[in-house]
């Protein structure tokens, strides 16, 4: 495989998407490290979940302090007094944190350079997402160029989920032998509940719909 004997850094939150990407990276690269960001998210459970998953999968885990984001912007992901809701009339969801993926990938690249890794893996997706502008493919491609110019390096940002909807993301996890692991051990819920979550927030509903659709399609293929 082309990427074998290469080292990768996975931007890791312990959620469904980044955990699926971690399994993908473990199949794709020889050495994998994870980096998680503490940006003042409303449930610290996310960081603990990411740490536990990294330990179970035997990959290095590092937390970087990005709490300054909470000083610069207000979001439902960082402020408990802000309700979690989808965007309406073209507005962004209340969970959008401006600049988050740009900063996370930039700092991940600095860390990658330090440990000799040239591959960055992130779970952003433009197909079945909440409308975040920093999840778009055009942004990732632009940032990839910027990072290489800024650090005079040849980083490659991998986005295994970019063109997958949630059902297809579950399918990928299943193909990687990780469906049950992802379903039971990850944290997607905006209210900090692991596994199937609260079932009511936008993240849980998207995750559940995708899983139900994939399982129905899988059962149909068996019939």
UniProtKB/Swiss-Prot annotation:
The keyword Zinc applies. It comes from the Bacteria. ATP binds at residues 12-22. Keywords: ATP-binding, Ligase, Metal-binding, Nucleotide-binding, Queuosine biosynthesis, Zinc. Homodimer. CDD domains: QueC-like. GO terms for biological process: queuosine biosynthetic process. This is 7-cyano-7-deazaguanine synthase. Belongs to the QueC family. Catalyzes the ATP-dependent conversion of 7-carboxy-7-deazaguanine (CDG) to 7-cyano-7-deazaguanine (preQ(0)). The keyword Chaperone does not apply. It catalyses: 7-carboxy-7-deazaguanine + NH4(+) + ATP = 7-cyano-7-deazaguanine + ADP + phosphate + H2O + H(+). Binds 1 zinc ion per subunit. Zn(2+) binds at residues 189, 198, 201, 204. The lineage of its organism: Bacteria, Bacillati, Bacillota, Bacilli, Bacillales. Pathway: Purine metabolism; 7-cyano-7-deazaguanine biosynthesis. Pfam families: QueC.
């Amino acid at each position: 495989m082309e990427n074998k004997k290469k080292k990768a850094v996975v931007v890791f939150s312990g959620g469904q998407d980044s955990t699926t990407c971690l399994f993908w990276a473990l199949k794709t690269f020889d050495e994998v490290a994870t980096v998680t960001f503490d940006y003042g998210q409303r449930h610290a459970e996310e960081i603990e979940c990411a740490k536990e998953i990294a330990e179970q999968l035997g990959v290095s885990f590092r937390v970087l302090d990005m709490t300054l984001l909470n000083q610069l912007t207000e979001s439902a992901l960082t402020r408990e007094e802000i309700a979690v809701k989808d965007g309406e009339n073209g507005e962004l969801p209340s969970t959008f944190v401006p600049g988050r993926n740009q900063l996370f990938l930039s700092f991940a690249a600095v860390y990658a350079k330090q440990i000799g890794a040239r591959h960055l893996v992130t779970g952003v997706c433009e197909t079945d997402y909440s409308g975040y502008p920093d999840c778009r493919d055009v942004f990732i491609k632009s940032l990839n160029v910027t990072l290489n110019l800024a650090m005079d390096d040849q980083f490659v940002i991998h986005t295994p989920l970019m063109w997958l909807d949630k059902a297809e993301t579950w399918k990928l996890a299943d193909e990687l032998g990780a469906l049950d692991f992802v379903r039971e051990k990850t944290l997607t819920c905006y209210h900090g509940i692991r596994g199937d979550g609260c079932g009511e927030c936008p993240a849980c509903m998207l995750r559940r719909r995708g899983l139900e659709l994939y399982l129905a399609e899988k059962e149909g293929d068996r019939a």
